């Protein structure tokens, strides 16, 4: 899908639904994701999952920027240890106004 204009070109936009597993809670992972996503101009949210070793990320925006975010999710902040990353690409919905941390 296209929809975001950049230099009079339509950029391809998408939505990712990702789950990051490993040592990703208690290491400022959610704030790392929020700050990275905002710098990339993405919208959505990040939240801890109740299982204790996983974080959910919902993000929308330019596909190129989403791919950069995915690289950062794999790396994580200092102190994190990412063991696995599950990603689903879904249709862009435009449902988010900002990128936030959910509780």
Predicted feature residues:
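Intrinsically disordered, low-complexity, mixed-charge
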Residues: 2-103
């Amino acid at each position: 899908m296209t929809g975001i204009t950049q230099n009079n070109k339509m950029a391809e936009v998408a939505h990712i639904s990702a789950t990051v597993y490993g040592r990703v809670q208690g290491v400022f992972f959610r704030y790392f994701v929020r700050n990275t996503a905002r710098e990339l101009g993405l919208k959505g949210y990040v939240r801890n999952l109740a299982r204790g070793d996983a974080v959910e990320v919902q993000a929308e925006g330019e596909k190129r920027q989403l791919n950069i975010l995915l690289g950062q999710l794999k790396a994580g902040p200092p102190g994190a240890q990412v063991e696995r990353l599950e990603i689903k690409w879904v249709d862009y919905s435009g449902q988010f106004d900002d990128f936030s941390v959910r509780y």
